[in-house]
Design a protein with these regions (language model features):
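C-terminal anion-handling pockets and recognition modules
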Residues: 1, 119-174
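Extended, low-complexity cationic-aromatic segments
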Residues: 1-68, 168-174
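Acidic/histidine-rich, metal-coordinating catalytic segments
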Residues: 5-6, 76-89, 110-113, 118
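Short aromatic-enriched loop/helix-cap "lid" or pocket-rim segments at secondary-structure transitions
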Residues: 13-16, 93-94, 119-122
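Short glycine/proline- and charge-enriched loop/turn segments
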Residues: 19-24, 102-106, 124-130
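RNase H-like polynucleotidyl transferase catalytic core
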Residues: 25-31, 100-119, 135-136
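Single, function-defining residue in the core of a domain
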Residues: 63-68, 72, 80-81, 85, ...
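Short, aromatic/basic amphipathic alpha-helical patches
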Residues: 91-101
Length: 174
């Protein structure tokens, strides 16, 4: 079983904690920009984390590329659990399944408006509010590097990844 979800990472930092001397407002020197990275992530039951980073919003062909990446790295048949993003239901994914991927891949959509049922959401929370807290980036290339570094650190924290799977609200029976 593999849990898949998408997230956006912006140049604006996710402030968790800040400090300034009494009477002085803390100021962060970051550009106001809507530039962002879109990230597709997959978390397996044994704590393997697969990530795909791109500079644009996730569309159907991007999902297909990620599914090919996933199939190349996870052996055997896969039950894939994800949300109801329109890119997941698009023609590109349907064509990919019809081309033979359905032999190894079974798709299961989560109920609408139930992101807490997807353990991958816990991965995003950990990345944004623990690994990347208070990180200020001025360019997408810098943000991409910081996100990659945070992901690599997280890959070694298998207890955190497994904790995302064991979270309340997500019961998995083997």
């Amino acid at each position: 079983m593999v849990f898949v979800d998408e997230a956006g990472f912006r140049l604006l930092p996710g402030l968790v904690l800040t400090y300034a001397p009494r009477g002085q407002t803390p100021i962060l020197d970051v550009p106001f920009s809507r530039d962002h990275l879109s990230v597709i992530g997959a978390l397996t039951l044994d704590g393997m984390l697969l990530i795909w980073i791109q500079n644009h919003s996730v569309k159907g062909p991007d999902v297909v590329r990620f599914l090919k990446h996933l199939l190349a790295r996870v052996p055997g048949k896969i039950m894939l659990v994800w949300d109801n993003l329109s890119a997941h239901r698009g023609q590109a994914v349907k064509d990919f399944l019809a081309s033979g991927a359905a032999k190894r891949l079974t798709l299961q959509a989560l109920p609408s408006y139930a992101p807490d049922l997807n353990p991958q959401e816990g991965v995003w929370r950990f990345l944004k509010y623990v690994e990347l807290k208070n990180i200020c980036c001025h360019h997408l290339a810098e943000l991409r590097l910081e996100v990659r570094r945070a992901i690599e650190r997280l890959r070694f924290k298998v207890d955190v990844l497994l904790g995302c799977i064991r979270q309340p609200g997500c019961v998995i029976q083997s």
